[in-house]
A protein has these predicted regions:
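Pocket-lining segment of extracytoplasmic ligand-binding domains
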Residues: 1, 62-158
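Acidic, polar ligand-binding/catalytic clefts
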Residues: 1-18, 90-93
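Extracytoplasmic
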Residues: 6-9, 17-19, 34-36, 77, ...
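Short secondary-structure boundary/capping segments
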Residues: 11-14, 31, 139
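Bilobed "Venus flytrap"/periplasmic-binding protein-like clamshell domains
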Residues: 17-79
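Ligand-binding clefts/hinges and TM-proximal coupling segments of bilobed small-molecule sensing domains
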Residues: 47-55, 122-196
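An extracytoplasmic/periplasmic, membrane-proximal ligand-sensing/linker region
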Residues: 72, 78, 89-102, 106, ...
């Protein structure tokens, strides 16, 4: 992948955090138990695939990855053909909420030091997933901060003009996304939240300034990001 990604891409806004789910039989007590096991990480090159590959590599765990669509993977896990299914998405995540089989549970993902540079700590509770967590229980996991990014097109190009139109439409209609029937995760998003070491798309920055959207300080943003996975 490009070495100078921060020069080739800009960001429009930070989005919400997406939690990581590891579903396996109750005999699997921790991530290390999946070493050498058959683990489905969804289809190649998607968000779940990328996150799972990075997390297992950093933890020094080497499962046998399988690339299956979530519904098929869960059926195979029920049948005993694979050992675990990984999913990444904002809670409540539909495929995880819909999985009902008391032989399985959510495996904890500890916030180990190798994960702390790129991920955030998160907590799942029985209120989030009563089908996989006993009443009153909680399971620690990690969360992936999602970002709406765009290629750094030159301002005088047609692509940049289309990006400008998209930003205006997206930002203008954004309050609608924070209400039903849209996903509750949209309520976590602050359009003005900064992304350290990244440049915001100039037209997005201009829109926020023109519409007097208050900037969020880096310290306040960091505090919000650390808290939001556990409280959303």
């Amino acid at each position: 992948f490009a070495k100078d990604i921060k020069k080739q891409f800009t960001y429009v806004t930070k989005l919400y955090n997406e939690e990581m789910y590891v579903i396996a039989s109750k005999s699997v007590r921790g991530m290390s138990d999946l070493n050498g096991k058959k683990v489905s990480v969804d289809l190649p090159n998607g968000g779940t695939f990328v996150t799972a590959a990075i997390v297992f590599e950093r933890l020094g765990i080497k499962p046998n990855f399988l690339y299956l669509e979530q519904r098929i993977a869960m059926e195979k896990m029920r049948a005993g053909e694979i050992d675990a299914v990984i999913a990444v998405g904002g809670k409540p995540y539909k495929s995880v909420s819909a999985f009902n089989d008391d032989r399985f549970h959510l495996v904890p993902v500890d916030y180990a030091k190798p994960l702390q540079t790129d991920y955030l700590p998160a907590t799942l509770t029985s209120k989030d997933y009563p089908n996989l967590i006993p009443e009153g229980g909680r399971v620690d996991t990690i969360a992936v901060p999602a970002v709406l990014a765009a290629y750094n097109w030159a301002p005088n190009t047609e692509r940049y003009r289309k990006l400008s139109q998209f930003v205006d439409a997206f930002f203008t209609k954004f309050p609608t996304f924070q209400n039903p029937p849209f996903h509750p995760k949209w309520k976590e998003v602050s359009l003005s939240a900064p992304l350290p070491d990244w440049q915001r798309l100039p037209v997005a920055e201009q829109w926020l300034t023109t519409h007097n959207v208050e900037a969020v300080s880096p310290a306040r943003c960091d505090e919000f990001l650390k808290q939001s996975p556990a409280t959303a």
